[in-house]
Amino acid sequence: RGNKFVCALMVAVLTTIVLPCFAQQHYGVMFYNVENLFDTINDASVADEDMLPKADRAWTVERFHQKLSYVARVIADLSDEDGFPAVVALAEVENRKVLEELVVQPQISSANYSICHFDSPDERGIDVAMLYRADMLSVEGCRAIRVNVESAPNLRTRDFLLVWGEMGGEKMLFCVVHFPSRIGGVKQTEHLRIGCAEQIREIVDSIVMADADRRIVIMGDMNDNPRNKSIAKTLRTKRKTKNLTHADLYTPFGNTKRGSSVYDDKWNHYDNIILSGNMLRGTEL
């Protein structure tokens, strides 16, 4: 099929890939860690004290509105001849209210984005979310999946977000994630990210068994690089498109020398988009 599905990863730098996939149309998909998109109202149920007008960060209404405008501009900048991205996955949003204010920003209001979001048990009060264009993605349902890591039963972190529907005549499932950070030590926290990856792999396997034709896109801040154990071994991702099966997961960033952020003068690619094999069978990038 001569169709194209465009995935764009937007973080500290912009990474784009164009995949031959399905419809005679382009569908833009992006992930963006917006880093602390909080409103200015104190929520006693979460630790948002640093993101208030009188806090050390002086998170005022003006700064909040400025950030909304910046995030909207980033989304708008990914527009192409087919318009705004069809799907925008986000990490580190405080609540639905900030998303409702984001989608009416003048830069993107004409996209008429719909919202998928659930409050998570994360201690910082940050969640993942997904915006989508209903004229491109017909959503049949969405749900939050609570993270369950056996080695850390009291872990309070971001839920996984699953959104399923139809795009370009194809059945789709989007999974938005934000794995636990490396704070406390890479090795000391690795089991948390591996536990998350195990759960995602189980979800993928169950979907593949029930509906082998459904195409899967996993995207988010995984706080690990594509060659780290959680992604390479636990998710069992492949770095080449040759001989992919519908049950395989492909990482387009497995061989890249650049990344999505820089720390200690070193590139990291913690922000990832991973695709099911049935999106790439018979193609070469």
Spans of model-derived segments:
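Metal-dependent phosphoester-hydrolase catalytic domains
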Residues: S206-I216, D224-L285
